[in-house]
């Protein structure tokens, strides 16, 4: 289920949690050694659901289950580059935490060669944390942030 205007990532939980659970149950049976990258929102909780399903099936490996939040890094690099008049590929903002609102934490103090005022840190952090909502509202619910998905045969 994709986000629509007025929804946040947690609104997707009821539908997406069931989808992730069903898919991971099948993975546990058909390809128990698979590396699993989860991008389904809310990533913070869908990864935990996947882990529990894999544990229940007796095939959980903490080194093979990933929550994909690279989008937050790309957005952070882009916003910092915009603000500082640089190219996004020349910026590297470490981002820790989850992929849901205030759990997204850009480590702006760790960006090499760039300093920020307290106001810039506050404004950038808020923009990065709310970027997903900004995209959904700009698209008026008319699409998904996902370019494509694929299934690799086991």
From Swiss-Prot:
Effect of residue 117 to N: In strain: WPP3 and WPP8
Class in the EC hierarchy, top level: oxidoreductase
Key words, A-Z: NAD, Oxidoreductase, Tricarboxylic acid cycle
Pfam families, A to Z: Ldh_1_C, Ldh_1_N
GO molecular function: L-malate dehydrogenase (NAD+) activity
CC per GO annotation: cytoplasm
Catalysed reaction, written as an equation: (S)-malate + NAD(+) = oxaloacetate + NADH + H(+)
EC identifiers of the protein: 1.1.1.37
Entry superkingdom: Bacteria
Residues that bind NAD(+): 16, 39-41, 149
Active site: 99
InterPro entries: Lactate/malate_DH_C, Lactate/malate_DH_N, Lactate_DH/Glyco_Ohase_4_C, Malate_DH_AS, NAD(P)-bd_dom_sf
Residues involved in substrate binding: 3, 9, 41, 75
UniProt-listed GO biological process terms: malate metabolic process; tricarboxylic acid cycle
Subunit structure and binding partners: Homodimer.
PANTHER family: MALATE AND LACTATE DEHYDROGENASE (PTHR11540), MALATE DEHYDROGENASE, MITOCHONDRIAL (PTHR11540:SF16)
Function of the molecule: Catalyzes the reversible oxidation of malate to oxaloacetate.
Family membership: Belongs to the LDH/MDH superfamily. MDH type 1 family.
Name of protein: Malate dehydrogenase
Organism phylogeny: Bacteria, Pseudomonadati, Pseudomonadota, Gammaproteobacteria, Enterobacterales
């Amino acid at each position: 289920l994709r986000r629509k205007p007025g929804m946040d990532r947690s609104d997707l939980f009821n539908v997406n949690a069931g989808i992730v659970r069903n898919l991971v149950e099948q993975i546990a049976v058909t390809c128990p050694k698979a590396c699993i990258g989860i991008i389904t929102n809310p990533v913070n909780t869908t990864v935990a659901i996947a882990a529990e399903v894999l544990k229940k099936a007796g095939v959980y490996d903490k080194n093979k289950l990933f929550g994909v939040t690279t989008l937050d890094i790309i957005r952070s690099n882009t916003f910092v580059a915009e603000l500082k008049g640089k190219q996004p590929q020349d910026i590297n903002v470490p981002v820790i935490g989850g992929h849901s609102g205030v759990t997204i934490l850009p480590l702006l103090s760790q960006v090499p060669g760039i300093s920020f005022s307290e106001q810039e840190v506050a404004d950038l952090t808020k923009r990065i944390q709310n970027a997903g909502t900004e995209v959904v509202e700009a698209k008026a619910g008319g699409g998904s942030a996902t370019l494509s998905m694929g299934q690799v045969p086991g």
